């Protein structure tokens, strides 16, 4: 189960290029042939934490997922929502994610928010980076305090102006290559969790 926003659905890249799809394919390669992986994605471009919470409530998702990923927050920042909303709703989403993951927090992987300052759209804006850091620092600290796996991929996206191959054709979102690099970091942790 992958929860999030445009960074989860893979805005402006092919249907199988998103990080959850690439993760699913990579997991399939690393497990026996008779092991199949299915993927459910609850994500939409523009979603804030509030949008995600409201949709999850309507979706009535099951609570038997072996692996859950959560990547959320960029639209709280982009839409200049009050930071206190994230402070309240990120922990709510963590609790919901754990419930979906068989009530096992070890089955949850939280992924950091990419930094869109390092894209043609973001134009190297220092204020964007500072605000993204604030969100990621909160998420990282919360995860560390609660024994939840947090994977930092933000540094990969901060190479987007020097390595244009990391940015999708829309000049804003990560490319297939960037998502591949995300998966290189997520995959070993996912394999370990699934084999426990």
Segments from the language model and where they lie:
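Serine-esterase "nucleophile elbow" of acetyl-processing enzymes
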Residues: 1-43, 57-63
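Structural recognition of the beta-strand scaffold that forms the well-ordered cores
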Residues: 1-2, 8, 38-43, 66-72, ...
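Solvent-exposed loop/turn segments at secondary-structure junctions
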Residues: 6-9, 44-49, 74-79, 114-119, ...
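Surface-exposed cleft-lining segments at the edges of enzyme active sites
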Residues: 41-44, 75-85, 123-127
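Oxyanion-hole/transition-state-stabilizing segment in secreted/luminal serine hydrolases
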Residues: 49-88, 115
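Charged helix-capping and loop-helix junction motifs
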Residues: 84-93, 131-135
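A short helix->loop->beta-strand "cap" motif at the edges of active sites that frequently abuts
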Residues: 98-107
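Catalytic His-Asp segment of secreted/periplasmic serine-dependent ester chemistry enzymes
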Residues: 115-196
